[in-house]
């Protein structure tokens, strides 16, 4: 039996022209002449026929049954089986009418009331101050209406020269800088034995490396040539004072390279220096400096790579808080400077338009869009409500109007993040189904971004590098520890600036693709995208472009932390977990006949992890639990059995991530406790380090421990604390219970090379200024000119180290000697 249908599919006001059946009976007092056909079932019976449960003919206005007794024939919905409640439709119609009237009245009120200022913004003149970097003043409505319009003479710019000394003092105290050496970090001075000329050359290298890496895609410091010259002039300057903004930018570049500052102190001192900068000529530089700090803190903290503790477990949360704070600070700077307004529409209060600042206008546009990208990107990946509506309300100049070819990659990224995904809730997108239109729109925009990268040849692959074919090509040759070591030591590739731009753009696409990928996607799998992401990070991890001449900066693993404006370590951990989960799912299917493709994929993943893990987990072979899981699931090689020769150790010298960070942490904590670290560091005798500078490039594999070694060798002992002294009575002591003493041999040519070494050290800071430091060649004087001179007769340097039953090592075996020294340091500190 067919299912009964309710309702009608035709109008009661029409007649069926193709049938003789009458659907509507003419109205009248009597229906005796009406032609009825009871063979047609009516859709709705009247109320009386329903109650009586009799057949209703549905005639209008009265059915036959109601007409017989003159009963008012009515049809309502109150007795309908599947109908809506009585009056529901009428109620909806009334609500629609009410809302329509309300909308019309609100529109009328809006048109009749005061206009919104953003809509009439360009109808009147907008003023700014006439300075190198302009300050936005608005319409100056009050001044115009009160006839007190200011003139150029009324504008007085604050001279912040008095604040410079305070800013430099804050930087010195917060970040442990050495005020006598051009405010360089004491960490670097001790690390490189006060070899100032070498340190100057090294800083020049890392400045160029910064503009090649972090500043390649996002132009944080723009124009690059201007900033390069400012930074190079800063490290070559002989003046004791300088511009704090440039100095702080240099310190951020140092932090990118050595990670030697505490992040909390760096954040606090950044806000202090910016707040104390009152010179309006530095507005644009301040804005770019804060953009640089935002980029840095978006990359999280290096403390997250240490073992979890009460101090490090909240490091990533702190980075989020600090980034939000700095974004709000720069948003205020944007409003004050009026960067969202076309400069041609701004009128200086002096009445003279300055048309000779086209270059400055370009710098303002690039800086504005750099901030807009950072703000939109951070809102996307952190789920922050959108509060920056400058681009929608005022539509400032696009970066494409500059027509600068090197800005094209940045323009492509801007169009994707700001114009396609601005205000998007990434968490909401990832929770949608594949068939949802919003999810499909997001994926279409993501694929359009990839197509643009491919169109402009900006999509980077591991296959672009010939020396990495052993990671991608399938070989029947079984991988052994010797072959693995040969492959790793042969990775001497150098990435250039276009490579870094392409890698960053590709990582933006792959990271978003990985986080929003669904399990049911047949085209892409999470493990495949994870491997592609890890391969790009492997290129950066093994990049050797900044390790020429064995300069030994920070461990190579730390170079991944602040390469992009997101936490790269979280992405790496996610990718490794995806590979591990895939291997577990493959084990569950081991009882079935596995396809040949799964076996090939397993071998590809296994080959890559065999090359990734020895570098990424170099100093965690036995302590990292996740590495042990990977070794079991992918049957990785026993990395602990790899034997490195002395030359191979030199190639893998900068992989001791944990030891390096512990040394930095110990140095920073000791400087805080002592509260006079800068004084101690400046009292080190220049001539005491002459022998170590000559063979600096032959440093220990753990060269960061020279921070402690310098203090250890030159510590001033005023009293006898139980150590062996070099007097005749103790030398003649025949007590066998005394510990073994091995004196350090002093260099015989120290005095001969004294003048040469001194001139080399002072070449960075020649005495060209009356306020500069006056270095004295007297050996009894210290580096610090303000400290009292101490005669060498009162100095007792520690020339002996007590060895507790350690083997005596000859001087010709340098590697063993360094290892023994390392043991001494470990047992001492």
UniProtKB/Swiss-Prot annotation:
Pfam families according to UniProt: Zn_clus (PF00172)
InterPro entries per UniProt: Yeast_MetPath_Reg, Zn2-C6_fun-type_DNA-bd_sf, Zn2Cys6_DnaBD
Chief place of localization: nucleus
Assigned keywords, A-Z: DNA-binding, Metal-binding, Nucleus, Transcription, Transcription regulation, Zinc
Keyword Ion transport among UniProt keywords: no
Location in the cell: Nucleus
Keyword Metal-binding: yes
GO cellular component labels: nucleus
Comp. bias regions, Acidic residues: 722-734
Region (Disordered): 722-741
GO molecular function: DNA-binding transcription activator activity, RNA polymerase II-specific; DNA-binding transcription factor activity, RNA polymerase II-specific; RNA polymerase II cis-regulatory region sequence-specific DNA binding; sequence-specific DNA binding; zinc ion binding
Location of the DNA-binding region in this protein: 46-73
Gene Ontology biological-process annotations: negative regulation of invasive growth in response to glucose limitation; positive regulation of gluconeogenesis; positive regulation of transcription by RNA polymerase II
Function text: Interacts with the SNF1 protein kinase.
Record's protein name: Protein SIP4
Organism: Saccharomyces cerevisiae (strain ATCC 204508 / S288c)
């Amino acid at each position: 039996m067919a299912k009964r249908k309710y309702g009608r599919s035709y109008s009661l006001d029409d007649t069926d022209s193709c049938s003789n059946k009458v659907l509507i009976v003419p109205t009248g007092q009597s229906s005796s002449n009406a032609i009825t056909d009871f063979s047609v079932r009516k859709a709705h019976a009247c109320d009386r026929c329903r109650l009586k449960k009799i057949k209703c003919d549905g005639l209008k206005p009265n059915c036959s049954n109601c007409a017989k007794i003159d009963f008012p024939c009515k049809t309502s919905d109150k007795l309908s089986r599947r109908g809506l409640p009585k009056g529901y439709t009428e109620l909806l119609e009334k609500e629609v009418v009410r809302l329509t009237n309300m909308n019309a009245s609100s529109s009328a009120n809006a048109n009749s009331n005061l206009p919104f200022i953003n809509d009439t913004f360009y109808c009147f003149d907008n003023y700014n101050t006439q300075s190198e970097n302009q300050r936005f003043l608005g319409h100056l409505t009050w001044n115009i209406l009160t006839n007190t319009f200011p003139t150029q003479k009324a504008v007085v710019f604050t001279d912040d020269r008095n604040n410079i000394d305070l800013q430099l003092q804050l930087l010195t105290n917060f970040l442990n800088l050495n005020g006598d050496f051009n405010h360089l970090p004491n960490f670097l001075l001790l690390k490189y034995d006060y070899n100032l000329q070498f340190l100057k050359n090294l800083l020049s290298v890392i400045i160029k490396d910064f503009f090649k890496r972090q500043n390649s895609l996002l132009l944080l410091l723009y124009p690059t040539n201007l900033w390069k010259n400012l930074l190079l002039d800063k490290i070559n300057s002989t003046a004791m004072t300088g511009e704090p903004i440039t100095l702080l930018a240099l310190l951020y570049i140092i932090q990118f390279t050595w990670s030697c500052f505490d992040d909390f102190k760096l954040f606090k001192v950044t806000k202090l220096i910016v707040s104390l900068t009152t010179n309006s000529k530095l507005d644009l530089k301040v804005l770019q400096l804060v953009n640089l700090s935002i980029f840095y803190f978006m990359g999280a903290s290096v403390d997250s790579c240490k073992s979890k503790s009460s101090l490090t477990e909240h490091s990533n949360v702190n980075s989020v808080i600090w980034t939000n704070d700095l974004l709000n600070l720069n948003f205020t700077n944007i409003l004050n400077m009026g960067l969202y307004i076309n400069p041609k529409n701004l009128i200086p209060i002096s009445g003279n338009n300055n048309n000779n600042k086209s270059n400055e206008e370009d710098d303002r546009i690039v800086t504005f869009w750099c901030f807009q990208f950072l703000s939109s990107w951070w809102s996307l990946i952190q789920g922050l409500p959108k509060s920056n509506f400058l681009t929608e309300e005022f539509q400032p100049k696009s970066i494409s109007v500059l027509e600068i070819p090197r800005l094209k990659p940045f323009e492509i990224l801007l169009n994707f993040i700001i114009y396609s995904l601005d205000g998007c809730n990434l968490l909401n997108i990832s929770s949608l189904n594949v068939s949802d239109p919003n999810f499909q729109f997001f994926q279409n925009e993501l694929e359009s971004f990839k197509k643009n990268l491919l169109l402009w040849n900006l999509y980077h692959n591991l296959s672009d590098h010939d020396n990495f074919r052993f990671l991608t090509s399938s070989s029947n040759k079984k991988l052994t520890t010797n072959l693995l070591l040969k492959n790793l030591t042969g990775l001497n590739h150098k990435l250039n600036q276009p490579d870094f731009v392409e890698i960053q753009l590709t990582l933006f696409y792959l990271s978003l693709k990985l986080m929003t990928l669904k399990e049911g996607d047949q085209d892409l799998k999470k493990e495949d995208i994870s491997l592609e992401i890890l391969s790009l990070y492997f290129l950066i991890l093994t990049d050797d472009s900044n390790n020429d001449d064995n300069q030994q900066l920070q461990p190579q693993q730390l170079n991944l932390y602040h390469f992009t404006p997101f936490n790269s370590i979280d992405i790496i951990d996610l990718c490794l977990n995806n590979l591990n989960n895939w291997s577990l799912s493959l084990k569950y299917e081991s009882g079935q006949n596995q396809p040949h493709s799964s076996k090939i994929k397993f071998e590809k993943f296994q080959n890559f992890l065999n090359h990734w893990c020895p570098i990424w987990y170099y100093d965690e072979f036995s302590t990292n639990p996740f590495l042990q899981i990977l070794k079991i699931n992918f049957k990785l090689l026993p990395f602990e059995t790899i034997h490195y020769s002395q030359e191979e150790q030199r190639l893998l010298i900068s992989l001791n991530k944990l030891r390096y960070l512990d040394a930095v942490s110990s140095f920073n904590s000791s400087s805080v406790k002592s509260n006079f670290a800068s004084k101690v560091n400046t009292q080190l005798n220049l001539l005491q380090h002459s022998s170590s500078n000559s063979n600096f490039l032959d440093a220990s594999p753990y060269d960061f421990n020279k921070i402690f070694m310098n203090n250890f060798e030159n510590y001033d002992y005023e009293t006898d604390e139980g150590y062996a002294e070099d007097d005749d009575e103790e030398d003649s002591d025949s007590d066998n219970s005394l510990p073994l003493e091995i004196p350090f041999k002093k260099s015989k040519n120290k005095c001969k090379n004294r003048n040469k070494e001194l001139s080399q050290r002072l070449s960075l800071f020649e005495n060209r200024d009356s306020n500069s430091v006056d270095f004295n060649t007297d050996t009894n004087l210290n580096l610090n000119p303000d400290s009292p001179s101490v005669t060498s007769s009162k100095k007792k340097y520690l020339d002996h180290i007590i060895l507790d039953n350690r083997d005596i090592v000859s001087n010709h075996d340098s590697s063993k000697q360094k290892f023994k020294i390392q043991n001494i340091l470990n047992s001492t500190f």
